[in-house]
Design a protein with these regions (language model features):
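A well-ordered secondary-structure block
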Residues: 36-120
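Mature exported/compartmentalized surface modules and terminal targeting/interaction regions
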Residues: 9, 120-121
Length: 121
């Protein structure tokens, strides 16, 4: 099964990334104690399965294991490589999901918070 990008899923992921920056937390459970499935329900998204990966990477010239992350491509590659090297995150990436959304938000000190959300409607 191939995974396709979905604008609604991008919105779901973006909201979570922005909330992690705005409310200063890093977790799948947000500042209102809502899980990824709760947040999908709040936006009236149908789903039979949903999963989420989160990560953060600094926008910096010398990030351990990544090198210079001061471009959209480099910082994205860095977070994806981190997910690929984590069994739980990688399981989400290769799971039987049909849709994907991605969101990113930056802190004032140039730390990028990424959210990747997968679903089967």
């Amino acid at each position: 099964m191939s995974v396709v990008q979905n604008d609604d899923m991008d919105e779901l992921a973006e909201i979570h990334s922005v909330n992690m920056v705005t409310f200063d937390f890093f977790d799948h459970v947000d500042h209102q104690q809502k899980t990824p499935s709760d947040r999908a329900d709040d936006l009236n998204f149908s789903w039979s399965s949903i999963a989420e990966n989160i990560g953060y990477v600094p926008w910096f010239e010398n990030v351990s294991g990544c090198g210079d992350t001061r471009s959209a491509e480099a910082i994205s590659e860095c977070v994806v490589e981190g997910w690929r090297n984590s069994p739980g995150h990688y399981a989400n990436m290769i799971g039987n999901f049909s849709e994907l959304g991605v969101g990113v938000a930056f802190t004032q000190d140039s730390l990028a918070y990424f959210t990747q959300v997968f679903r089967i409607p």
